[in-house]
């Protein structure tokens, strides 16, 4: 499967922002495939983005054969764009998901990027060794607990900046007060006549 173009695509909603109030609407979501369960003629795909997870249901009779076949080939961490109709779940509500009372019935599926099997599961409270998580930091940052930490840090930093700006402070970044970069970049010297 080749990666498909994003030309003409625009996300209308984030996965975790969907709710029963959007039932009947056509939406476009983009995200990573978290799980793919193929029940033969019925494929359940959980799609995750930074806001949460939504279930997409590819069903024989509702989706054409090519779409069903494409969905069956999806693997963990593939990046996809899906356009479909939001519907109330016909089966049991999933209490573990904020979007557990709805699902998307797809009209189109685009695979934006394929992925090899990740070295560890992208899930909360992963039991993976820290050494492996740090080696694949770009994957580790997709985990829900780290996403929460990043959002909290961003929120605190924004509030702090707003407070000090409101008090008339000016934010200044100077080379002498900045952090050093341990990735091999050399610190640059600033000539000074003081020393």
Q: Language model features by range: what are they?
A:
Residues 1-195:
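Class II aminoacyl-tRNA synthetase catalytic cores and aaRS-like
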